[in-house]
Each structure stands twice: as C-alpha cells, then as structure tokens.
Amino acid sequence: MEWYMGKYIRPLSDAVFTIASDDLWIESLAIQQLHTTANLPNMQRVVGMPDLHPGRGYPIGAAFFSVGRFYPARRRGNGAGNRNGPLL
C-alpha cells in the first residue's frame, strides 16, 4: 500500500477538505461544522484532520485559514496546534 498525502486529501467543497483514509470514521456533525465554519466571512480554507470531531459550534481537529479576519473562538484553551500568522 502506498502512503502519501495526496491520496487522502478529499475535497468536500471549494473551501472544505478532509485528510483521512477510506477506513476512518468521522462524525457527520464534525463535517457539518466544517462547512458552517467555511461560511464565516473571509474564511478561505477549512481542513479536517484525521482526529476531527465535533466541538461547541466549531470542529476540533481542523485547520482554518482566513484572510483579514481573526476568529478568537477558533482558538482552543490549551493552545494545541495554534498558529496565528499576520493579518493580510
């Protein structure tokens, strides 16, 4: 079996993607939250990672890219995986 990321990056829409194998089970509420988050103003891309699961309104285990707008609610209290770049 070949293991490379291109095989597991799955577009769900123009702005929403998941990184997951065919065997990975992801809760439908988490997918719904990805789409809801992608509809926020200035949100460019939303990517669910293999550990994706539903949160309180926003999915946990995802990466978010927005331009010109910062969403503090997207940051988790423990700071896990947070990377905040400059606002463009």
From Swiss-Prot:
InterPro entries, sorted:
RtcB-like_sf (IPR036025)
Q: Which GO terms describe its biological process?
A: RNA processing
- Its name, as the record gives it, is Putative uncharacterized protein YkfJ
- Domain of life where this protein originates: Bacteria
